[in-house]
Amino acid sequence: MSLNGFYLLPHPPIVVPEVGRGEEKKIENTTKSFEAIAKDIAGKAPNTIIIVTPHGTMFQDYIALAYEDEISGSFKDFRAPNVSMELKINKELTSKIYELAYGERIPSVMATNDILKKYNTSVFLDHGCMVPLYFINKYYKEYKIVHITYAALSDIELYRFGMNVTKAVEELNENAVFIASGDLSHRLREDGPYGYNPAGEKFDKELLNNLKDGNVEGVFSIDKDTVYNAGECGRRSVAVLLGTLEGKKFKGEILSYEGTFGVGYGVMKLEAFSNDTSKLKELERIRKDEYESKKQEKDPYVKLARESLTQYLTTGEAIEEIPDYVTEEMRDLKRGVFVSLKKFGDLRGCIGTIFPVTDNIAEEIIRNAIEAGLNDPRFYEVGKDELVDIDFSVDVLDEPESATREELDPKKYGVIVTHGRKKGLLLPNLEGVNTVEEQLEIALEKADIDSHEDYTIEKFMVTRHKES
């Protein structure tokens, strides 16, 4: 047998009546859709439900497969500790998925309590799983679970992992269904928990329509800025889901979509109806084209940063002769420079200088690009094979000037706090830093300065260069 059910489900705890306490009535269509999906799954009577979630114990660089005899959880973090569940894990299928993924060098880990206790946690059922299962359990309980927490891997790696889920199910002749747990944009309303961004509605519409049409390439071609600004948590679950459908034509049915609370809740059922050509090679082509486009970047600042780290990772030597495309300004001016690396929207390294330590901006970029990739103490060293998925940005700092708290603006100015020899800097216009208080708190923490100590404040502006 093979997978015989494919679903995209949200996970708002508020839809559970014991949590919502009446508020769940505001997303009544989501409730009805959960009920319909639960009945559909009960009709299939699977012996295993495979679910991928954003909210289990997550490793940045390894997909985590829960591997204990049982897994349990409750809604205690959502005011409903009496609503709990305990499920048996299908260890044979979990082990087979891991074995196949490991054989293809897809970063994965069998997450046991012994391993997780090193990180002060354990195997547990998170709300990303429990919300869908709450409704399923009303109609059907004769199943084991495979619990997967995705990681910040490339679309290709997540897709290939999904392919191995299907392969494992087929090799073991399991009767199983697959659930991709994920909310869509978290930025649909000003009064929502994460505010409003027009990219939210755009992302949700594009993702759902592409899934409805069975357009795999369309899903993976959604503009990265749109994905990032939407603030979603479901796209990586969808990448695994699409991998389980590799080689199949499919269509999707949107049972409901609501954004009442500022977060997109999309409920979908996908149905494979015939064989299709492989989409994997096309996705690999898209990824290669994106990388080639990055290497042809026209902005000389980020172009130099990428070439600097690339050459060092390739040859072990830094760029010595400044390339011809470098501008006169970059050759003649001395400025502090920060080089930032992001992988799939998450920070992967950032090192910079408040004041210049080299002869010009170009040399500062060459130096700090290597430092950001290899010597940011928050991260392990960047590998050469990661460069295809990393986006570079370069901030050139203006001269800092003394400032008062009232003169700060986290969107316009960066900030430097100083107490004795302790100094902390935070760049301007950073995601998640919206107030002066937040900006100062982070800068003080970076400098290990207590907020009650006397410290000086400086502000500065930057010219930010990003890959197009």
UniProtKB/Swiss-Prot annotation:
GO molecular function, one term: oxidoreductase activity, acting on single donors with incorporation of molecular oxygen, incorporation of two atoms of oxygen
Domain of life per record: Bacteria
Location of the region described as Unknown in the Swiss-Prot/TrEMBL record: 1-289
InterPro entries listed in its UniProt record: AMMECR1 (IPR023473), AMMECR1_dom_sf (IPR036071), AMMECR1_domain (IPR002733), AMMECR1_N (IPR027485), AmmeMemoSam_A (IPR027623), Uncharacterised_MJ0810 (IPR023472), Xdiol_dOase_suB (IPR004183)
Domain named AMMECR1: residues: 296-468
SUPFAM superfamilies: AMMECR1-like (SSF143447), LigB-like (SSF53213)
Disulfide bonds: none
NCBIfam families: AmmeMemoSam_A (TIGR04335), AmmeMemoSam_B (TIGR04336)
Protein name (Swiss-Prot/TrEMBL): Protein CA_C1420
Organism the protein comes from: Clostridium acetobutylicum (strain ATCC 824 / DSM 792 / JCM 1419 / IAM 19013 / LMG 5710 / NBRC 13948 / NRRL B-527 / VKM B-1787 / 2291 / W)
